[in-house]
Amino acid sequence: MSITDLIRLYSSKPTDFEYYCANIFKKIGFEAVVTPPTNDGGYDIKLLKNNNIFALVECKLFDKTKVGRPLIQKLVGASVTEKANNLIFITTSDFSNEAIEYANATHVQLINGENLIKLSERVYHSDNKNYFDEDSVRLDIQDFLEYIPKDILAICYDNM
């Protein structure tokens, strides 16, 4: 799946994108609680580990608009109310320089569109027992020749 696919899939109902992100965290072992669509308190997902708040997550389904500092500040403000030590901001686009600087200063983990796709692939491919990394498997002609009967090989090589 690509960023374009995600935007196309969720643009009519961005709250479903929040559930998509929550499911990624569920796959890696968190309890992920999605907040109501309105009055969400400045975050979209509360991550719990052993019934304790682990992190707050804000999700933005943006096409080309970069996430700016004010949205990161809103998430940081929510952490005070919820007493969350870890903050994660996910977007399908990217972050402005000011947002990156502020996130670094306040220890907010940023996940842009490119990294979201990588994370999704890693999480969902780990479930697929038939999945393999194509780059890690290379076959050459010798790998096939051992399975072709000798008499057929003789005919093939005589005709070359």
Model features per residue range: what roles?
Residues 1-41, 46-160:
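Mixed-charge (Asp/Glu-Lys/Arg
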